[in-house]
Design a protein with these regions (language model features):
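Structured aminoacyl-transfer and RNA-binding surfaces used for tRNA recognition/handling
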Residues: 1-241
């Protein structure tokens, strides 16, 4: 199951009446097993799963497995509404293909004020003023406080490897707007369909969307997509092959 999320394998450690058993018992010392037992409050017949991989892969695969087990073992109270605010998101994440840090949310999100001095020297430990509201595992709201200071915005661009010239070339309208005074601002976007889905007690968002697209992205109500006239393609400068 975890291979879908990029994990290569899933190891386990189970506490039985005779002691620890499982695929990782041979590679852990008795002291390490006891440390895990204390730290995780492991009791008899409890089982611990491990993924040894890059941090993001391990977190994604084990998080998905945890949710799956919750459903499969009927451990989730479907009549409860559990809200959770998620804050202090990482400001950046490392892109191994490009060998540089990129914005984890987007480059216009404000960093936490106490992390501003670390943007260039320690980007891995900078956190943002982004926030999500989660209900029963579904993201309902997502937003952030935005950058309203030009010097700070330039510093964030520099942290993701963008020169000042590139920033002005790609976002000239945005960078120029700072010169006229930008007030502190932020906001959220709400996932209304997800909220409706939870209230309706369904796991399929198409059940609550007024005119849902099919799996092939066609709109049955509007009968779209429809054939395009060659004159329209010519006007738009689009050539199909």
């Amino acid at each position: 199951y975890v291979k879908v999320y990029g994990a290569k394998a899933l190891a386990n450690l189970k506490l039985t009446a005779e002691g620890f058993a499982g695929s990782v018992t041979k590679v852990l010392s008795d002291a390490e097993k006891e440390a895990l037992r204390t730290m995780l409050n492991i009791e008899e017949n409890d089982i611990v799963f491990f993924v040894a991989d890059k941090k993001k892969v391990a977190q994604s695969s084990l998080g998905a497995l945890r949710v799956k087990l919750g459903h499969d073992l009927d451990l989730i109270n479907k009549d409860a509404y559990e809200f959770l605010w998620v804050t202090d998101f990482p400001m950046f994440e490392y892109d191994e293909n490009e060998n540089r840090y990129v914005a984890a949310h987007h480059p216009f999100t404000s960093p936490n004020l106490e992390d501003v001095d670390k943007l260039l020297s320690d980007p891995a430990h900078c956190y943002s003023r982004a926030y999500d509201l989660v209900l029963n595992g579904y993201e309902l709201l997502s937003g952030s406080i935005r950058i309203h200071d030009q010097k700070l915005q330039e510093k964030v661009f520099e942290a993701i490897g963008m020169t000042l010239e590139e920033a002005h070339e790609k976002f000239s309208w945005f960078m120029d707007a700072f010169q006229y005074g930008t007030p502190p601002h932020g906001g959220v976007g709400i996932g209304l369909e997800r909220l409706t889905m939870i209230l309706a007690g369904t796991d399929n968002i198409r059940d609550v969307v007024a005119f849902p697209k099919t799996a092939s992205a066609s709109d049955l109500m509007a009968q779209a997509p429809s054939p395009v006239d060659p004159a329209q393609l010519k006007e738009l400068g689009i050539e199909t092959k």
